[in-house]
Swiss-Prot record:
SUPFAM superfamilies according to UniProt: Nucleic acid-binding proteins
Protein name: Small ribosomal subunit protein uS12
GO MF annotation: an example: tRNA binding
Subunit structure: Part of the 30S ribosomal subunit. Contacts proteins S8 and S17. May interact with IF1 in the 30S initiation complex.
Protein keywords: Methylation, Ribonucleoprotein, Ribosomal protein, RNA-binding, rRNA-binding, tRNA-binding
InterPro entries attached to this UniProt entry: NA-bd_OB-fold, Ribosomal_uS12, Ribosomal_uS12_bac
Database matches in Pfam families: Ribosom_S12_S23 (PF00164)
Biological process annotations from GO: translation
Keyword rRNA-binding: yes
Family: Belongs to the universal ribosomal protein uS12 family.
One GO CC annotation: small ribosomal subunit
Length: 124
């Protein structure tokens, strides 16, 4: 416990919360250009080929971003929108690409959770 005199001299320091998505620079999303589109394997108990792209953002950062959903149309110079949100079993992937925005097409034949994958409402 600090004495009154110590508190007068120094005061209490407030803990500064570190951002989990520093590349977004306090914005909800950021635009960027794909520099590399590739697949990678997840951490130990899981097994898959996860689709990931390396993106150079307008904020100057270059980050890895996960491409959710089944199938995608991204290539090297595609312009994509990035949001925060990590992928637990891919180390270093702290961002998601927004499907159905800019050059990233929505998921085809998606009927549930459509808004998360940029899919339009199917015709009856």
């Amino acid at each position: 416990m600090a004495t009154t005199n110590q508190l007068i001299r120094k005061g209490r320091t407030t803990l500064v919360e570190k951002s989990k998505v520093p590349a977004l620079k306090a914005c909800p999303q950021r635009r960027g250009v794909c520099t590399r589109v590739y697949t990678t394997t997840p951490k130990k108990p899981n097994s898959a080929m996860r689709k990931v792209c390396r993106v150079r953002l307008t904020s100057g950062f270059e980050v890895s971003s996960y491409i959710g959903g089944e199938g995608h149309n991204l290539q090297e110079h595609s312009v994509v929108l990035i949001r925060g949100g990590r992928v637990k079993d891919l180390p270093g992937v702290r961002y998601h690409t927004v499907r159905g925005s800019l050059d990233c097409a929505g998921v085809k034949d998606r009927n549930q959770s459509r808004s998360k994958y940029g899919a339009k409402r199917p015709k009856k």
